UniProtKB/Swiss-Prot annotation:
Pfam families linked to this entry: BCNT (PF07572)
Alphabetically ordered keywords of this record: Activator, Chromatin regulator, Nucleus, Transcription, Transcription regulation
GO CC annotations on file: Swr1 complex
Residue stretches of biased makeup (Low complexity): 223-261, 276-292
Residue ranges constituting the BCNT-C domain according to the UniProt record: 272-354
Role according to the record: Component of the SWR1 complex which mediates the ATP-dependent exchange of histone H2A for the H2A variant HZT1 leading to transcriptional regulation of selected genes by chromatin remodeling. Involved in chromosome stability.
Family listed: Belongs to the SWC5 family.
GO term, biological process aspect, one: chromatin remodeling
Lineage start: Eukaryota, Fungi, Dikarya, Basidiomycota, Ustilaginomycotina
Segments for region (Disordered): 1-93, 109-134, 222-292
Compartments, record wording: Nucleus
Protein name: SWR1-complex protein 5
Assembly and oligomerization: Component of the SWR1 chromatin remodeling complex.
Start-end of Polar residues biased regions: 1-11
């Protein structure tokens, strides 16, 4: 208000200093034009439209009554719109907050979610989810391994049973009932351990082979084992007829002396010489052992290692048989290589010396 009054004061003085013209009346000296309030002052004061109309600036400094009235009106109008301006400001703040909230929601949706906004939040979320995923993955791996082992056992049992049934069925269909019976009995045959002596690098080695009882080598070995105890048993001496013992004579015998004589009993066969066990051992020792080359010796050592059940478990033996016979078909080159590497690592860890 003071700035408005000060700005209008020079205008009133200039009007008073101007000379009176012939067209002006005597009342022009007392005329003071009303000053319009500036837009800047109205904006700074925050007055509403009603306050703008009530503000009136006077140019006459001597009129104290008009100045006091104007000051009172200005104070009243300034007090009245204060609450309205505060409410308007609060409404503006609420609208701005709502707009900011909506804008943030749009940014979150465009970024792909709340967890992708900040790097720290994203890393913390990834670390927490990674630990949970690791535990879940370990449990899933263990469950898959157990399931695969169970399925492998079932497949192996079904394949062994189906192969034997197919052979028996084929033999029965062709009318070869003897071979069908042989195959059915072979499935239940017991294995026979046969010692084998061989020579390698100037040294004698003895290995044990497990063969079915129907194998020719097994039959030969069993026949030799049966013949050796039979030869060692002593045969009972045959009773010899005593020539010194006279036969009792009777009247009937004398009367029938003229009749043809009865046939004489057969003479006992001469006894064979009993072979000693030492001769059998010497014969076995004098037999020339089989000479092996490096490849045959390696194969024999590998077979001996596989036959030792104290070093390999049944599951490892089954896996070894599967890999040896089938060669990892259908698994792919890399898959078969990884399976073999894992198997060899397990065997190495199991058989490692402390």
């Amino acid at each position: 208000m003071h700035s408005i009054a000060n700005s209008s004061a020079p205008v009133s003085r200039s009007v008073r200093d101007m000379p009176n013209s012939g067209s002006d009346s005597d009342d022009d000296d007392d005329f003071v034009p009303d000053a319009e309030p500036s837009h800047t002052a109205v904006v700074r004061s925050g007055l509403s439209k009603q306050g703008k109309d009530a503000v009136v600036a006077t140019d006459d400094p001597s009129d104290s009554d008009s100045d006091s009235d104007a000051d009172g009106a200005h104070s009243e109008t300034q007090d009245k719109p204060a609450g309205a301006s505060v409410r308007a400001a609060e409404q503006i703040d609420a609208d701005e907050l709502e707009a900011l909230r909506k804008e943030r929601e749009e940014l979150v949706a465009a970024a792909g979610g709340e967890q992708r906004l900040g790097k720290r939040r994203r890393l913390a979320h990834v670390s927490e989810s990674g630990a949970d995923n690791q535990v879940t993955n370990d449990n899933e791996v263990q469950a898959l391994k157990a399931k695969a082992a169970a399925e492998w056992e079932a497949i192996k049992a079904s394949e062994s049973g189906s192969s034997m049934n197919e052979q028996v069925t084929q033999s029965t269909a062709t009318g070869d009932y003897a071979s069908a019976t042989t195959l059915a009995s072979t499935a239940r045959q017991e294995m026979v351990s046969i010692p084998t002596t061989y020579k390698f690098a100037g040294e004698l080695h003895t290995s044990m082979r497990l063969l079915p009882r129907s194998h020719p080598d097994a039959l030969k070995y069993l026949s030799s084992q049966i013949a050796s105890p039979t030869s060692t048993t002593s045969s009972a001496p045959a009773p010899s007829a005593s020539a010194s013992a006279p036969l009792p004579t009777s009247p009937a015998s004398t009367s029938t002396s003229s009749s043809p004589s009865r046939p004489q009993p057969a003479r006992p066969t001469p006894r064979r010489k009993k072979p000693s066990s030492l001769s059998a051992l010497s014969a076995a020792a004098t037999t020339k052992p089989t000479k092996l080359n490096t490849l045959e010796k390696s194969k024999l050592d590998w077979d001996t290692y596989k036959s030792d059940h104290s070093q390999l478990s049944q599951q490892e033996l089954d896996e070894l048989e599967h890999q040896t016979k089938r060669g990892g078909k259908g698994l792919g080159d890399m898959k078969g290589y990884l399976d073999r590497s894992d198997f060899l690592d397990r065997v190495k860890n199991r058989t490692a010396q402390p």
